[in-house]
């Protein structure tokens, strides 16, 4: 009896075609649920972890953006404050969460860019442990002094500091905090010597500057704006490239004409990140919602009134910012010899 033959195609070829077809079915079977899940996102409450105490800039930003996410998607957004260790405890919680888009971190320059250089045993990697979602806002630091200090501008301050090396103190919200590094960067740029006094939080540092226990602070605008407006502190300059809309009478440090401050910028910034491995479709969807919310008049006005500048951008650009800021602040940490408490 003649062997079985298929006209035009051999048995071996048929088996190869069958294997390829089955492989394709497996791929489609695996990919389909993930694709459908991404399309259905979000379908349950989203949690934004703020790694600081309630009431500060990150908390205000998280709640403002969370409200807009709810309006756009119909799902509730829960803001949870998990403070401690300079924000690294809350950040680590998000790094270890499921990468499904339902747990986000309101990241900060401190937790995402400064911490790797200050904390040698950091439990997460700011680049490898997270997926960038959306840069939310930049917050200029305001250089403010006690009202009785005999200086009216940055040039006079630098002259005073050089005439009195080591006799002027400044406060920050803690050793290795963003405000600490900003002032160290200012010191390096102006070649001045100012003594650092670390506090447990920004508020007591600001209040001691008002009381005259220390002479200076260089910290986020929201913390000092009320004291400047009431005349209890003198604002000499802001760390941003442009003047703030809400306090346009305060010049930028770059405008001071002081040698070393040309092009000076040391803003704080805040943005949402998700656990690494979160599907790109989800991070892109969140990015679009956040960017649209930042362009809304009500939220833009609210953020600016708090001293924050809306800063919508792509996840890719936000990722590049994080990486460049890690390098930048590492150089400051090394040169200043800053270590965690």
Task: Indicate where each model-derived feature is located.
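Solvent-exposed, polar/charged alpha-helical surfaces in well-ordered, non-transmembrane soluble domains
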Residues: 63, 67, 71, 92, ...
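Short, surface-exposed alpha-helical segments at coil->helix boundaries
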Residues: 59, 63, 180, 184, ...
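Hinge/capping helix and adjacent helix->loop/strand transition within the periplasmic-binding protein
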Residues: 96-102, 109, 117-204, 253, ...
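Short, low-complexity disordered leader/linker segments with a strong preference
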Residues: 1-43, 155, 340-341
């Amino acid at each position: 009896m003649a062997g079985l033959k298929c006209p035009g195609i051999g048995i071996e070829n048929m088996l190869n075609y069958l294997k390829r077809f089955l492989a394709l079915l497996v791929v489609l079977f695996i990919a389909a649920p993930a694709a459908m899940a991404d399309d259905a996102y979000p379908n349950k409450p989203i949690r934004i972890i703020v790694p600081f105490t309630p009431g500060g800039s990150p908390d205000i930003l998280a709640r403002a953006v969370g409200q807009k996410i709810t309006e756009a998607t119909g799902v509730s957004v829960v803001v949870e404050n998990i403070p401690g260790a300079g924000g690294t405890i809350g950040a680590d919680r998000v790094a270890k969460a499921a990468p499904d888009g339902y747990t986000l971190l309101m990241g900060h320059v401190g937790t995402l860019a400064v911490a790797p250089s200050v904390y040698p045993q950091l439990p997460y990697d700011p680049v490898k442990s997270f997926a960038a979602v959306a840069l939310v806002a930049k917050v200029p630091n305001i250089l403010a002094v006690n009202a009785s200090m005999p200086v009216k501008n940055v040039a006079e301050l630098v002259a005073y500091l050089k005439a009195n090396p080591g006799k002027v103190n400044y406060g920050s919200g803690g050793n290795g905090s963003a405000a600490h590094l900003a002032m160290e960067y200012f010191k390096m740029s102006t070649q001045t010597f100012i003594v650092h006094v670390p506090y447990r939080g920004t508020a007591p540092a600001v209040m001691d500057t008002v009381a005259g226990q220390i002479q200076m602070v260089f910290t986020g605008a929201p913390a000092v704006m009320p004291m400047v407006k009431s005349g209890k502190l003198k604002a000499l300059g802001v760390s941003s490239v442009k003047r703030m809309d809400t306090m346009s009478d305060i010049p930028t440090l770059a405008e001071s004409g002081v040698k070393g401050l040309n092009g000076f910028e040391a803003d704080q910034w805040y943005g949402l990140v998700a656990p690494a491995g979160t599907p790109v479709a989800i991070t892109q969807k969140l990015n679009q919602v956040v960017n649209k919310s930042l362009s809304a008049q009500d939220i833009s006005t609210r953020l600016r009134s708090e001293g924050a500048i809306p800063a919508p951008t792509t996840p890719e650009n936000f990722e590049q910012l994080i990486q460049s800021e890690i390098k930048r602040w590492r150089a400051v940490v090394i040169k200043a010899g800053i270590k965690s408490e």
